[in-house]
Amino acid sequence: MAADVFMCSPRRPRSRGRQVLLKPQVSEDDDDSDTDEPSPPPASGAATPARAHASAAPPPPRAGPGREEPPRRQQIIHSGHFMVSSPHREHPPKKGYDFDTVNKQTCQTYSFGKTSSCHLSIDASLTKLFECMTLAYSGKLVSPKWKNFKGLKLQWRDKIRLNNAIWRAWYMQYLEKRKNPVCHFVTPLDGSVDVDEHRRPEAITTEGKYWKSRIEIVIREYHKWRTYFKKRLQQHKDEDLSSLVQDDDMLYWHKHGDGWKTPVPMEEDPLLDTDMLMSEFSDTLFSTLSSHQPVAWPNPREIAHLGNADMIQPGLIPLQPNLDFMDTFEPFQDLFSSSRSIFGSMLPASASAPVPDPNNPPAQESILPTTALPTVSLPDSLIAPPTAPSLAHMDEQGCEHTSRTEDPFIQPTDFGPSEPPLSVPQPFLPVFTMPLLSPSPAPPPISPVLPLVPPPATALNPPAPPTFHQPQKFAGVNKAPSVITHTASATLTHDAPATTFSQSQGLVITTHHPAPSAAPCGLALSPVTRPPQPRLTFVHPKPVSLTGGRPKQPHKIVPAPKPEPVSLVLKNARIAPAAFSGQPQAVIMTSGPLKREGMLASTVSQSNVVIAPAAIARAPGVPEFHSSILVTDLGHGTSSPPAPVSRLFPSTAQDPLGKGEQVPLHGGSPQVTVTGPSRDCPNSGQASPCASEQSPSPQSPQNNCSGKSDPKNVAALKNRQMKHISAEQKRRFNIKMCFDMLNSLISNNSKLTSHAITLQKTVEYITKLQQERGQMQEEARRLREEIEELNATIISCQQLLPATGVPVTRRQFDHMKDMFDEYVKTRTLQNWKFWIFSIIIKPLFESFKGMVSTSSLEELHRTALSWLDQHCSLPILRPMVLSTLRQLSTSTSILTDPAQLPEQASKAVTRIGKRLGES
């Protein structure tokens, strides 16, 4: 029988030399030629039609590589071939293949019989095939039609062998009426066969079009889909994978020129042997599904294939700022941390911005203009006259500071020789009248104070001039300040910075002592001659997105035909005399209202003081002038300790003064005292931009007005969000529970239906309930009417009865009732069924006592007959017995638990006996 089963497998060809010529790369166990090889018959010797395909010719001697091979017989078409054209054709031979593997012998010969005279040769590859068939068809088969063995990695010749075996098994079972050990067929139309035998055990869970939902099968199908095109390319190239790009280009031109070759279906492609190319691919899809690791953000600058259109994927990369010029960002980490620690408790919100190191000029010089620069227009009343008090003697010795080229924030600009000072008109004196002290060669105190007070700007008689803390004088100043005017806009970009400065103008910040009349201290900026060497270090603004609206006044940049000296008066701010030793100064004016966001102070390599007040309080009736002052220490002080940087963003408050805030800084550096309204950004009608906190990572910019959100507000927001989420979950749970209840009420089956169908059936169900309720209400109304009619009839009948009945004494009546109860008790204790009988006859006893009279024998005879006629007839007894049984069923457990009825009967007669004893 085993021979009959395995005869369907293709036999090894007799011409090995031709096999080598045609398919040198296929091993012997994968040979699929259908030329038969003779085998000795089994011990049974039964010749069956299953051997019709076997050849009885004796095997010729095997031809060596140099022998002449005999002519090959024409191939036999088996049943499993069906409509497959050229099922034995394999891909062309590859270069450098080992031809010795073709001559490998995989056939195993088995000897059996008493004298081992019978031999049977079985191909070893059939074992694997039948294992696959057992795995795929572990149940019963229905028909011998062609089976694709979906989900199994089989080649076409293996599928043909398996289908031949299945067809042979069907032939043996139905035509030869014999059993076979491989496959068994059942007929669904046969009534004796259980229907469950046709069900595949793997078909319990379906997934898409596959009837087996194992992950290995899904991965294998994914590999087929992934490697199909690459295998198509391998038809046109050798094993050298380096020529894959050239083949891609060749196929691309073939596509546009000669057109594509007609694609072969994936299942019929002879190249779909996934063992060949799985080593060339790294499976990343299912490995990431199993590990559940978060995908890292790709760095587009590390991708080598940015030029290939297939590698470019859409994303948020164009929205990211360019970080190439932020290579040296480490010095600002301490700046952020120290600023939050120092000023965290002073202001409700702080906005930190990276302040660059003035010693680090970048390699980019072309951002700043060097020729035509705008001038600054100021009111005439604010410009100092040429006859102002003598300025402090300034040391004109220039300072050339060293710089690092890797810092991209600092823009150096060389200044040429300064021009003569600009003459200013007289009206400056009434506003700023202060004598100037002579310079002192001694160094200033350790902690000078730089108060910043927003007073009324243009009022000649200010109502409340503030006092200053520690007014100092300029010591031996070895610096040459410069002035930069900076026009702020809503959005600052590094492409077109709105920055203008005077290239050939050096200005000296001079201060005056307060007059005895306590006039408001002002700041006069006068030009001074500078040597051609000092360099102004310019802080290039980083792109910052300012939210909160557009500024009130438009920003204009007026170009000048030539560099002109500029004289500036800083308005809306008071800067007390402070000592700056040995460093050149720069003043940057920023036009535009800025809300006070916070204070930033940290220690950097050079002493920098950044002061940016804007739109501070003004006197009534005076037009508002928005300005900001940036005082930057630009010197290269080798002997002085590092000084902090403080940036003040004043708010657009309307009240004159607020609480004074004093910020102590590190030793040796000037102190900055801020006196101003200490409150958050007011929600006023005017639009004023808010500076956003520049975080180190450009991925997460914070565009809120406050650079650092309040933890209480964050906690409240999270609490409110959690409440919203909880309420939403409760709402959805209630809706789901109500729909489940509706489904349980309106539908008998457990099949899930849509909400629309559920609501429609609910409406129908409610309508039916309303109709039933109306019918019940109508029935109750009708029954009430009948009860009223019956009560009226009973009352009318009772009115017709006589007022007196049979003359029976009360004592005699009670005595007869006691005798009846005693009799019932005695008989019930003997047999509990008598208690049921006593309940039935008790109405008869009552009627007997009322009708029968014992006054005389004739009267007794007459009343007894009358009682029998009236109360003992069947029409009277039937409803009486029925009512008695109804009372029995309601007062006892005769219907629910009849076993307790004897106990209840004994208890009833016992109660009757106790009542008799008490009476």
From Swiss-Prot:
Q: Where is the composition biased (Low complexity)?
A: 44-56, 686-706
Chain intervals for the UniProt region annotation (Mediates heterotypic interactions between MLXIP and MLX and is required for cytoplasmic localization): 832-881
Output compositional bias ranges, type Polar residues: 670-685
Its chief place of residence is cytoplasm
Q: Name one GO molecular function term.
A: DNA-binding transcription factor activity, RNA polymerase II-specific
- Where Phosphoserine occurs, residue numbers? S9, S27, S33, S39, S669
Q: Where is this region: Transactivation domain?
A: 322-445
Q: Where is the composition biased (Acidic residues)?
A: 27-37
Q: Pfam families annotated for this entry?
A: HLH
Q: What keywords are annotated for this sequence in UniProt?
A: Acetylation, Activator, Cytoplasm, DNA-binding, Membrane, Mitochondrion, Mitochondrion outer membrane, Nucleus, Phosphoprotein, Transcription, Transcription regulation
Q: Please list where the region (Required for cytoplasmic localization) is annotated.
A: 73-327
Annotated segments matching region Leucine-zipper: 769-790
* Positions of the UniProt region annotated as Disordered: 1-72, 542-562, 633-712
Q: Which residues carry this modification: N-acetylalanine?
A: A2
Q: Which domain of life is it from?
A: Eukaryota
Q: Which Gene3D superfamilies match?
A: Helix-loop-helix DNA-binding domain (4.10.280.10)
Which Gene Ontology BP terms does the record give? Answer: positive regulation of transcription by RNA polymerase II; regulation of transcription by RNA polymerase II
Protein's name according to its UniProt entry: MLX-interacting protein
Q: Which gene encodes it?
A: MLXIP
